[in-house]
UniProtKB/Swiss-Prot annotation:
<dbReference type="InterPro" id="IPR018187">
    <property type="entry name" value="Asp/Glu_racemase_AS_1"/>
</dbReference>
<feature type="binding site">
    <location>
        <begin position="191"/>
        <end position="192"/>
    </location>
    <ligand>
        <name>substrate</name>
    </ligand>
</feature>
<dbReference type="GO" id="GO:0008360">
    <property type="term" value="P:regulation of cell shape"/>
</dbReference>
<feature type="binding site">
    <location>
        <begin position="81"/>
        <end position="82"/>
    </location>
    <ligand>
        <name>substrate</name>
    </ligand>
</feature>
<feature type="active site" description="Proton donor/acceptor">
    <location>
        <position position="190"/>
    </location>
</feature>
<dbReference type="GO" id="GO:0008881">
    <property type="term" value="F:glutamate racemase activity"/>
</dbReference>
<comment type="similarity">
    <text>Belongs to the aspartate/glutamate racemases family.</text>
</comment>
<feature type="active site" description="Proton donor/acceptor">
    <location>
        <position position="80"/>
    </location>
</feature>
<comment type="function">
    <text>Provides the (R)-glutamate required for cell wall biosynthesis.</text>
</comment>
<comment type="pathway">
    <text>Cell wall biogenesis; peptidoglycan biosynthesis.</text>
</comment>
<dbReference type="InterPro" id="IPR001920">
    <property type="entry name" value="Asp/Glu_race"/>
</dbReference>
<keyword id="KW-0961">Cell wall biogenesis/degradation</keyword>
<dbReference type="Pfam" id="PF01177">
    <property type="entry name" value="Asp_Glu_race"/>
</dbReference>
<feature type="binding site">
    <location>
        <begin position="17"/>
        <end position="18"/>
    </location>
    <ligand>
        <name>substrate</name>
    </ligand>
</feature>
<keyword id="KW-0413">Isomerase</keyword>
<dbReference type="InterPro" id="IPR015942">
    <property type="entry name" value="Asp/Glu/hydantoin_racemase"/>
</dbReference>
<dbReference type="GO" id="GO:0071555">
    <property type="term" value="P:cell wall organization"/>
</dbReference>
């Protein structure tokens, strides 16, 4: 375990993803915990993580999480399903700050949401092949799980393409087998995918409930910070600070971050981690 001075409640929350997808989680945390400061790192130089070998994903995630801990973050949020599947156990053994991931929160929400017991899961190749979702759903034996990889979705989001006939056609191809299985609940098992929720909903139909882990993850962040007496005190630090950083092209990351997050993004820092 890496031992550092225990951060106080005024320390930032560290969030990372392979790119812009984790901004969906950051946005929800900002909305639900408006007094918390945040450092967000998008590893665009090495992402997307989905097609990479698990060992490589673990290597990239380790490097970024180490930096966030070194910079005094009081909590690490792995805002990437592929990295959560590859790195969660290592992270919780390595760091003495709380580590929150995005897979279990989505599973909890899907189990509560389904009406017919048939749940679909879509994600990157790495996430689907890891079996992480399937393993967690196994704790609810009444749930029938159908999984499908949607490898091209992340690339579209990273290029800022979130609607249009081309992406809809691709979505329909990916999702048709899940429709055929009669799923009534679909887990968006990649933090990029909520940015395609309009297209995915159109392809699946209005009768299917889409589950994003962002809302449930933010609830976990609130609960764990509260349990550890780490919630920021707005009377002591009324104005939170936000740092959004990219290991790759900062200009493209800046454009997408401002589009997805709005005015909270004032400057993008190029991080050479």
């Amino acid at each position: 375990m890496i031992e550092r001075p225990i951060p106080g409640a005024d320390a930032p929350i560290g969030i990372f993803d392979s790119g812009v997808g984790g901004l969906t989680v950051a946005r929800t945390i900002i909305d639900q915990l408006p007094h918390e400061s945040i450092i967000y790192i998008g590893d665009t130089a090495n992402g997307p993580y989905g097609p990479l070998p698990i060992a490589r994903v673990r290597e990239h995630a380790l490097r970024i999480a180490d930096e966030l801990v070194e910079r005094g973050c009081k909590m690490i949020v792995i805002a990437c399903n592929t990295a959560s599947a590859a790195f969660l156990r290592d992270a919780r053994e390595r760091y003495d700050v709380p580590v929150v991931e995005v897979i279990l929160p989505a599973v909890r929400r899907a189990v509560a949401a389904t009406r017919n017991g048939k749940v679909g899961v879509i994600g990157t190749v790495g996430t689907i092949n890891s079996g992480a979702y399937q393993d967690l759903f196994a704790a609810s034996p009444s749930i029938e799980v159908h999984a499908a990889a949607c490898p091209r979705f992340v690339d579209f989001v990273e290029r800022g393409i979130t609607s249009g006939r081309q992406i809809l056609n691709i979505a329909e191809g990916y999702l048709e087998p899940l429709q055929a299985q009669g799923v009534d609940t679909l887990v968006l098992g990649c933090t990029h995918y909520p940015l395609l929720s309009g297209v995915i909903q159109l392809a699946m139909g209005d009768h299917v409930t889409l589950v994003s882990s962002a809302e449930e993850t933010a609830k976990d962040v609130l609960r764990i910070l509260s349990q550890n007496d780490l919630l920021a005190d707005p009377t002591m630090h009324p104005t939170p600070t936000y740092s959004f950083e990219s290991t790759g092209d900062p200009e493209l990351f800046s454009q997408l971050s401002r589009r997805f997050l709005g005015p909270v993004v004032t400057q993008i820092r190029h991080n050479m981690v």
